[in-house]
From Swiss-Prot:
This is Quinolinate synthase. The gene is nadA. Keywords: 4Fe-4S, Cytoplasm, Iron, Iron-sulfur, Metal-binding, Pyridine nucleotide biosynthesis, Transferase. One of its GO terms (cellular component) is cytosol. PANTHER family: QUINOLINATE SYNTHASE, CHLOROPLASTIC, QUINOLINATE SYNTHETASE A. Its EC number is 2.5.1.72. Its cofactor is [4Fe-4S] cluster. It catalyses: iminosuccinate + dihydroxyacetone phosphate = quinolinate + phosphate + 2 H2O + H(+).
Length: 368
């Protein structure tokens, strides 16, 4: 068991009966429990979740929106978080001690968040301090563990989302000369470049070799990027863009900034999940779009805008596998367990970690 979590030892695997229930019966039971529990139950759902789950969300949004919703909700006793592990951790840290945060399936993790563990990060900070002294401030994408957020908090740094990355990177440079950006190198690189920092003033820290990779003068380095990435957005390529340009020259290409620099540079637009949703929403009827982000969201956008021609930038994309672990059976299981007065898959972050991580989260939330 992780030192950051205290999971109730009741039943950790989905009981067999949920595999045999019909969709109609499961949906009926979820509605019954939601109605019965009223405001004591709150279900936030990330945009990348399946439709079968999102339909029951009390709030749907990207990571920033859900962080803000979690921080403002004081009424619900139970928060059943339909997202991935780091999001549930964030919800637990921003809510009161009396509120219980539950993740329907504990296997719903994030490969990007796992690419930066606290031991690697502490070691990297020590080595980088030897090179650059007290000139660095850490920023972490919210797609990171509570321990990494806490590291940033106690070292004067903050969290960022894809919605506010430019704002937070700009703030970071008012604090220190250099920025260490974890764990997604692509969001960090794309954001810094948009703010006018050339690529040769960026370096990449490889946590597996404990080495700094750079092309320019080491004294000129302003941004140190952690060598991590999103496994979903890594699958969008310049070749995908070339194919769209060739076969559909009048199609707009919009991607998430977790895509690599080359893909973002070759696209027409790049922005957060909310940015993509809003852009398509406001686009004229008949417009054509190729979207480079998670497939559940792309399919939902397609369904919501039948008046527009919308495709995935990569025709062979699949949904985020860890997000997809949260499904209707796991949601119902979590709710029925609460109904019986029991608790499963409780996310409870260590108190000291919470205090330090909240410093980083609040430095972000007070600026957005």
């Amino acid at each position: 068991m992780s030192i950051l979590e205290k999971v109730q030892p009741i039943e950790t695997m989905l009981p067999e009966r949920y595999y045999t229930m019909s969709t109609e019966d499961m949906e009926k039971r979820v509605r019954e429990i939601k109605e019965k529990m009223g405001e004591t139950l709150f279900i936030p759902g990330h945009h990348y979740q399946k439709d079968e789950v999102v339909q029951f969300s009390d709030a749907a949004g990207d990571s920033l929106q859900l962080a803000q919703v979690a921080a403002s909700n004081k009424e619900a006793k139970y928060i059943v978080f339909c997202g991935v592990h780091f999001m549930a951790e964030t919800a637990d840290m921003l809510t009161t001690d009396e509120q219980v945060v539950i993740l329907p399936d504990m296997r719903a993790g994030c490969s990007m968040a796992d690419m930066a563990d606290i031991e690697q990060t502490e070691r990297a900070w020590k080595e980088l301090t030897k090179l650059f002294g007290d000139t660095m401030i850490p920023l972490t994408y919210v797609n990171s563990t509570a321990a990494i957020k806490a590291f940033c908090g106690r070292n004067g740094g903050a969290t960022v989302t894809s919605s506010n990355a430019k704002q937070m990177v700009s703030w970071a440079f008012t604090q220190k000369e250099r920025l260490v950006f974890l764990p997604d190198q692509h969001l960090g690189r794309n954001t810094a470049y948009d703010l006018g920092i050339p690529l040769d003033k960026m370096a990449v820290w490889d946590p597996h070799t404990d080495s700094l990779e750079y092309d320019g003068d080491i004294e000129e380095i302003q941004v140190i990027l952690w060598k991590g990435h999103c496994s979903v957005h890594q699958n969008f390529t310049v070749k995908n863009i070339e194919n769209v340009r060739k076969n559909h020259p009048d199609m707009n290409i919009i991607v998430h900034p977790e895509c690599c620099y080359e893909v973002v540079a070759a696209s027409d637009y790049a922005g957060s999940t909310k940015y993509i949703i809003d852009m398509i929403e406001s686009a004229p009827s008949g417009s054509k779009w190729a979207i480079g982000t998670e497939m559940n969201l792309v399919n939902r956008i397609i369904q919501q805008h039948p008046d527009k021609e919308i495709v995935s930038l990569n025709p062979f994309m699949c949904p985020c596998l860890t997000m997809n672990r949260i499904d209707l059976p796991h949601l119902l299981w979590a709710l029925e367990t609460i109904e019986r007065g029991e608790e499963i898959n409780v996310i409870s972050v260590d108190k000291q970690v919470t205090e330090e991580a909240v410093l980083a989260l609040n430095r972000m939330l007070e600026r957005v």
